[in-house]
Amino acid sequence: DRICTGITSSNSPHVVKTATQGEVNVTGVIPLTTTPTKSHFANLKGTKTRGKLCPKCLNCTDLDVALGRPKCMGTIPSAKASILHEVKPVTSGCFPIMHDRTKIRQLPNLLRGYENIRLSTHNVINAETAPGGPYIVGTSGSCPNVTNGNGFFATMAWAVPKNNNNKTATNPLTVEVPFICTEGEDQITVWGFHSDDETQMVKLYGDSKPQKFTSSANGVTTHYVSQIGGFPNQAEDGGLPQSGRIVVDHMVQKSGKTGTITYQRGILLPQKVSCPSGRSKVIKGSFPLIGEADCLHEKYGALNKSKPYYTGAHAKAIGNCPIWVKTPLKLANGTKYRPPAKLLKER
C-alpha cells in the first residue's frame, strides 16, 4: 500500500489509513462504503421472491394456509427467496387451537425455507377405517367451507367414533403414516387431537379421561397428554363458541420414510400432506414488495449495491449485497499530498 509523493498538490487533501504508513494525506480518494437508509422491501433481482405463502388467499394467515383451513386453500408460488413478514404470535383461526403446546407456530417458517411447496392430491390415511374405528369425519360450524357449510382443516380428519359400539375407552392404537410425496421432496405431515370437558368427551368418545398421543418420524418422537376441561368458551371469526380445544403438531418425513402416530380418543388423523422441495432463503421483512433490488436487508429493506461495502446496522442480508464494515473505507487514487510551500522549497 505504498503511496508516492506527487509534484502537484490539491487544496483539499484527504486522509487514508494504510497498513505500513499509518494515516497519509493524499490528493484524491474513491469512497468504498455507503451508509444505507431504511426503505421498503422489494423483489430480489434475478429470483422469484415470495411474500405470503398464498398471495391469492385473502384474509388468511400463513398458518391458515399451511394447515389447509377452508377458504384458505390455494397455490403457493415457487420462490428462491422468501419474506418472513408475520408479526408474532403466528395463529390460525377456524377451531380454537392451543398454539403454544406444540411447535405448530413454526410450520409456516419451515415451509418458507423450501423453494417449491405443494399439497398432496390424496389423503395419506383413510381416516374412516383407521384403528379404533369405524369413524365419521367430524366438522365444525366454526370452520365454514367455500359453500359456508361445516368444514375442517384439509390436513387433518377429526376421527369421531361412528356408533355407540366403539364409543368406548381404548388402549393406545398405532397407525403408520406412509411417505406419499415423490422422490426429492420432503413430506410434512400435520396431525393433532381434540379435547373437551368431561360431558362432551363422553358424548363424542365414550371416555372422559385424559388421552395419550405420540408421534414419531425421522428420529424425532413427541409425547402429549390431553387436558380435560377447564377451557373458557371461545369463538373463532364469528363462529359458534367452543368449549373444546385442539392441539396441532407436525412431523417431517424424509423420502421413503414411514412415520407413526399412537393415539387414543380425539385423534385428528393426517390427511393431505405438504410436499416441499428445493431451498429458499428466508429473511425478516415487511409488505408491500415494491420494485426490485440487488439486496434485501433485515434492517434497511431493499438495497441496491452502489458501493462494495456499507457501514451502519449489521444484520442478515440476502442477494448481491455490500459487505458490512465498522468504519468507512477509502481507496487512494491520487498521490501523497504535500503543501505548496514545501513543494517549492524542495524544488
Curated annotation (Swiss-Prot):
Glycans are attached at residues 25, 59, 145, 166, 304, 333. One of its GO terms (cellular component) is membrane. GO terms for biological process: fusion of virus membrane with host endosome membrane; fusion of virus membrane with host plasma membrane; symbiont entry into host cell; virion attachment to host cell. It is a single-pass type I membrane protein. GO terms for molecular function: host cell surface receptor binding. It is found in: Virion membrane; Host apical cell membrane. In natural infection, inactive HA is matured into HA1 and HA2 outside the cell by one or more trypsin-like, arginine-specific endoprotease secreted by the bronchial epithelial cells. One identified protease that may be involved in this process is secreted in lungs by club cells. Binds to sialic acid-containing receptors on the cell surface, bringing about the attachment of the virus particle to the cell. Plays a major role in the determination of host range restriction and virulence. Class I viral fusion protein. Responsible for penetration of the virus into the cell cytoplasm by mediating the fusion of the membrane of the endocytosed virus particle with the endosomal membrane. Low pH in endosomes induce an irreversible conformational change in HA2, releasing the fusion hydrophobic peptide. Several trimers are required to form a competent fusion pore. Belongs to the influenza viruses hemagglutinin family. This is Hemagglutinin.
